[in-house]
Curated annotation (Swiss-Prot):
Pfam families: DHDPS. Pyruvate binds at T45, I203. The gene is dapA. Pathway: Amino-acid biosynthesis; L-lysine biosynthesis via DAP pathway; (S)-tetrahydrodipicolinate from L-aspartate: step 3/4. This is 4-hydroxy-tetrahydrodipicolinate synthase. GO terms for cellular component: cytosol. It comes from the Bacteria. Belongs to the DapA family. PROSITE patterns: DHDPS_1, DHDPS_2. It comes from Shigella flexneri serotype 5b (strain 8401). Signal peptide: none annotated.
Length: 292
């Protein structure tokens, strides 16, 4: 369940900014039918930063209910205060989720020792599998391979989403962890190369709109059919890149609406609607991918 194409699913909202259950059901049904390995609910792409804690928990539980054991659900549970991250994680004990995706603390920029102690404390307060999440472009701090190696020895820490896009990280981390430590790319554009170097899959933004293609690409890569996987990847490459033409999840939420997967592309401030130029850029990438 922690391999292949795992979607960082958007959180669909109605025009008033309330979570839209009907659209979330449609999205989850789409991923079940498309072969997506698992869903990450309320991660970065799911707008964790603009949901309060009760809403955050409610959306994860809604996703679990709608998934109805057809597809595993992973909860985003990161925070920049350790006690807050522990509290959020503990909300999901015995809930039915299969694990947590826990981002590095943002804004306060802890040291490597601070990062180690943060993740260690979370893991010690739950039995849920923990996936570390390193995305320094958003958080302002970088979880270095040496620290990952230390954390890999902590009970319940089972893998990492590595979103630097730096492919040298794969081998650097692999040298410091056991073979069963899960390495997931957090960068769609380099995910196939990441897998060819020994990664196990991707937590994907692109999969929101190209679920079947991403699942097939990851399946081919896992079977060693990299030439065939690369054909799919090249068709998706403009989409991998252009879904970040404006801050995530603005473009991907609009793309979901354009494909009829959600009813609206409503976001909460400070996220604002996609611009006209952004819309045309993403539409062209969707056409190149054969999705329009």
């Amino acid at each position: 369940m922690f391999t292949g194409s795992i979607v960082a699913i958007v959180t669909p909202m109605d025009e008033k900014g309330n979570v839209c259950r009907a659209s979330l059901k449609k999205l989850i049904d789409y991923h079940v039918a498309s072969g997506t390995s698992a869903i990450v609910s309320v991660g970065t792409t799911g707008e964790s930063a603009t949901l309060n804690h009760d809403e955050h928990a409610d959306v994860v539980m809604m996703a679990l209910d709608l998934a109805d054991e057809r597809i595993p659900v992973i909860a985003g549970t990161g925070a920049n205060a350790t006690a807050e991250a522990i509290s959020l994680t503990q909300r999901f004990n015995d809930s039915g989720i299969v694990g947590c995706l826990t981002v590095t603390p943002y804004y306060n920029r802890p040291s490597q020792e601070g990062l180690y102690q943060h993740f260690k404390a979370i893991a010690e307060h739950t039995d849920l599998p923990q996936i570390l999440y390193n995305v320094p472009s958003r958080t302002g701090c970088d979880l270095l391979p040496e620290t990952v190696g230390r954390l890999a020895k902590v009970k319940n820490i089972i893998g990492i989403k590595e979103a630097t896009g730096n492919l040298t990280r794969v081998n650097q981390i692999k040298e410091l962890v056991s073979d069963d430590f899960v390495l997931l790319s957090g960068d769609d554009a380099s995910a196939l190369d990441f897998m060819q170097l020994g990664g196990h899959g991707v937590i994907s933004v692109t999969a929101n709109v190209a679920a079947r293609d991403m699942a097939q690409m990851c399946k081919l890569a896992a079977e060693g059919h990299f030439a065939e996987a690369r054909v799919i990847n090249q068709r998706l490459m403009p989409l991998h890149n252009k879904l970040f033409v404006e801050p995530n999840p603005i473009p991907v939420k609009w793309a979901c609406k354009e494909l009829g997967l959600v009813a609206t592309d409503t976001l909460r401030l400070p996220m604002t609607p996609i611009t006209d130029s952004g819309r045309e850029t993403v539409r062209a990438a969707l056409k190149h991918a054969g999705l329009l």
